[in-house]
Curated annotation (Swiss-Prot):
Pfam families: Fer4_NifH (PF00142). PROSITE patterns: NIFH_FRXC_1 (PS00746), NIFH_FRXC_2 (PS00692), NIFH_FRXC_3 (PS51026). This is Light-independent protochlorophyllide reductase iron-sulfur ATP-binding protein. HAMAP family: ChlL_BchL. Belongs to the NifH/BchL/ChlL family. It comes from the Bacteria. GO terms for biological process: light-independent chlorophyll biosynthetic process; photosynthesis, dark reaction. Homodimer. Protochlorophyllide reductase is composed of three subunits; ChlL, ChlN and ChlB. The gene is chlL. GO terms for molecular function: 4 iron, 4 sulfur cluster binding; ATP binding; metal ion binding; oxidoreductase activity, acting on iron-sulfur proteins as donors; oxidoreductase activity, acting on the CH-CH group of donors, iron-sulfur protein as acceptor.
Length: 286
């Protein structure tokens, strides 16, 4: 099974991806996480350091694929999750999508691409150009990370449009949304009324999740010394269980940009009225 994780930049994709990868491993699956971001920090919380990238390794070998060994590019992370960082071209030059293609090509050359039960692509930002939409070509499911805000849902809608386009020629489906760092889901619910799709989980704003990123650890690893975090791990295990059940998924029908803008902005301009219970007149007497 191959998964692609997308979402607005800074929404917590890498932190979420790493914890989902560990959750899948806890369910007995052999997992490979591939970071598809020039920052090459997707797997930081799994390995605790910035691992060398595929592109760095290929450049050092003058792009002689036959001189590259699995141990040159695949690093073992926490929980037995294997990690790869695609890397990227220099800033302002080249195509990141090309790098993703080279990464898949190399892993196939190493006979590593088919050795895993689950491969998870963690893809940068919300700019789903043809290049960075490349992981969708290899994926069975797309997961979109969002919060309860306007910008993240607007980005989610653009990603949904990319999934719909890729699904024309690939067996790709949208598994659903994952709400992250949000105490509410009212705007998410408003969006999925207009654009029907599953919501796999909504994670509240938990400071320990943010801290885990800074520490270079997954929540699962932190829970080994802080048992109170086991309840947080359950969120990710729930997501893993839903994915492993191979959901039917959807081919989303994204909303037109202007329609979505009106829908989401109207939610803020004309918020739903709070319903309050009627107060008996005698209760007002002092």
């Amino acid at each position: 099974m191959k998964l692609s994780v997308y979402g607005k930049g800074g929404i917590g994709k890498s932190t979420t991806s790493c914890n989902i990868s560990v959750a899948l491993a806890r369910r007995g699956k052999k997992v490979l996480q591939i970071g598809c971001d020039p920052k090459h920090d997707s797997t930081f919380t799994l390995t605790g350091f910035l691992i060398p990238t595929i592109i760095d390794t290929l450049q050092a070998k003058d792009y002689h694929y036959e001189d590259v060994w699995p141990e040159d590019v695949i690093y073992r992370g926490y929980g037995g999750v294997d990690c790869v960082e695609a890397g990227g071209p220099p800033a302002g030059a080249g195509c990141g999508g090309y790098v993703v293609g080279e990464t898949v090509k190399l892993l196939k050359e190493l006979n590593a691409f088919d050795e895993y039960d689950v491969i998870l692509f963690d893809v940068l930002g919300d700019v789903v150009c043809g290049g960075f939409a490349a992981p969708l070509n290899y994926s069975d499911y797309c997961l979109i990370i969002t919060d309860n805000g306007f910008d993240a849902l607007f980005a989610a809608n653009r990603i949904a449009a990319s999934v719909r386009e890729k699904a024309r020629t690939h067996t790709l489906r949208l598994a659903g949304l994952i709400g992250n760092r949000t105490s509410k889901r009212d705007l998410i619910d408003k969006y999925i009324e207009a654009v029907p799709m599953p919501v796999l989980e909504v994670l509240p704003l938990i400071e320990d999740i943010r801290i885990s990123r800074v520490k270079g650890k997954t929540v699962f690893e932190m829970a080994e010394t802080e048992p109170s975090l086991l309840t947080v791990c359950d969120y990710y295990l729930n997501i893993a269980d839903q994915i492993l059940a191979r959901p039917e998924g959807v081919v989303p029908k994204d909303a037109a940009d202007r329609d979505l803008f009106s829908l989401l902005s109207d939610f803020y301009l004309n918020p739903p009225k709070q319903t309050t219970e009627a107060i008996a007149p005698e209760a007002l007497l002092v």
